[in-house]
Amino acid sequence: MANNNNYKFETLQLHVGQEQPDPASDARAVPIYATTSYVFHNSQHAADRFGLADPGNIYGRLTNSTQGVFEDRIAALEGGVAGLAVASGAAAITYTIQALAKKGEHIVAQKTIYGGSVNLLEHTLPLYGIESTLVDVHKLDEVEAAIKENTKALYIETLGNPNSDIPDIEALAEIAHKHGLPLVIDNTFGTPYLIRPIEHGADIVVHSATKFIGGHGTTLGGVIVDGGTFDWAASGRYPWISEPNPSYHGVKFTEAAGAAAFATYIRAILLRDTGATISPFAAFLLLQGTETLSLRIERHVENTKKVIEYLLNNPKVEKVNHPSLPDHPDHALYERYFPNGGASIFTFQIKGGRKEAFEFIDNLEIFSLLANVADVKSLVIHPATTTHSQMTPEELEDAGIHENTIRLSIGTEHIDDIIADLEKGFAAVK
């Protein structure tokens, strides 16, 4: 669109990337471009594409026109300069870390994040020489003390998983930038409709598009958004981006791609070599979800408020962990960063232990017991024995996950039916 700043979120989510109908067919909907490769006009055109002088399609592992619309749209919604869609959220996170840190280098990360990200940082990446320190990001002194000479990024989530704890993004951005580091934020649970981390100092945003962006539990996908705010050339700490890269005939990505150097590096090198490519069909389905993102999020938030009120008044509930509550330690940050509400994925502690948690979960009907979240359908799981089961008892305690912790993902069903289903679960607890 001529100027994305002139349009509201609800308009951008429908139009960015396909301002005019498809030129080949006049189709209004974004077509699924089911092709592996693309015809070049002539030899010079092919050379320009491979040399990054012309940013168009080269090969399906790197780009696809359906994928391109999706990337442009999410980048616009986040306020970034470029997007890169990949096969899953895990791929988006992995590529981002691999693009920032190499063998012998280090990442500082929030400890209360998705269990899969903890495993990646603590177990998988160390096999490739990348170490991590997980910290309590509410203790800013602890964050700063964890930064070493070889630290390459600070990694956090807008809403922690599973307890929806909230970091002070602006304070952490200040620390990261003071040490010449980019701030990376996983905004999967926040969504750009509720919070745009780049506006608060983040440099790179990642998403599991499988969640709220897709919204319907049908499609895996991930997105990396380059904020275009970090000066890779001035930093001098990321030579594979700012200096001649021997893996791509000596190109300097900061010169070839300008503000979009980070996203371009991942596409041209990491995606090229390891191939976690999103399919055109997956990109199409995620675009369908994107077009209703604001409408769905409003309903998720509305329903969540009513579920929290119900749980607070239930005698079988020991504690509700939600940042909207005045006694939550992150309540002030919630009001500051989420003025329109949020955190439809949260936990509560049932009175008792694992037995009572299982009884409650196993007697729900509308809530589906599965590992996904952020679906239009309401979901439930027991984190300690599933999504976070690879963590040690000490790590679970640090993350605020107990035997009686239950995670809810509140969907868009009628609220009366959601509450009635929760009643069935509690009635089964002896």
Residue ranges: model-predicted function:
Residues 2, 10, 122, 149, ...:
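PLP-dependent enzyme catalytic core of the Aspartate aminotransferase-like
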Residues 154, 222-224, 320, 346, ...:
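Well-ordered beta-strand positions enriched in small/hydrophobic/aromatic, beta-favoring residues
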Residues 1-57:
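N-terminal glycine-rich, Lys/His-bearing helix-loop that initiates the first secondary-structure elements
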Residues 2-4, 17, 21, 84-314:
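Conserved PLP-enzyme active-site core in the AAT-like
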Residues 274-277, 281-283, 288, 292, ...:
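Conserved small-domain helix->loop->beta segment predominantly found in fold-type I
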Residues 18, 34-40, 228-229, 242, ...:
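Glycine-rich beta-alpha junction loops
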Residues 42-91, 116-123:
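Conserved N-terminal alpha-helix of the aminotransferase class I/II PLP-enzyme fold
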